[in-house]
Amino acid sequence: FLSRDLRYYYGPMWRELAKPSEACNTYCYRINEVAENDPYLLIAHHYTRYIGDLSGGQILKGIAQKALNPPVGEGLHFYDFPRIEDSKAWKTEYRAVLDGLNFDEQQKNALITEANYAFRLNMYMFDEIQGDAGKSLWKIFWNTITGK
């Protein structure tokens, strides 16, 4: 889906034109580092992105729709989850699966620490994109999905 959006915004040469930002490179570096050294911590990144995109991402989709006003069906595929019919039920089941994983206290604490770091990396990307407005939106949606 992301490649369709990039193709819409940048055209057929999107791979040459769309270069990752410093924040994106930092995030990718961390994901690769975790994958190599502590792969179970990838769960924290998956949780942060997937739950975030399913929850606050839908809010951001509406904001992007209004701000960018792309033609219907263009430029916002990133926020579509066609295989998930009921996002609330899916999130509940996903959290139940995570709660059922057999991690010791040290691993649980490491996952929480990594999820918080993943959140900060996401905020760094938002800062690059939109400055303080992006950071505020990200905080609102993070607090919404975590119940804080």
Which residues fall in each region the model found?
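Metal- and O2-centered redox machinery and metal/ROS homeostasis
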Residues: 1-148
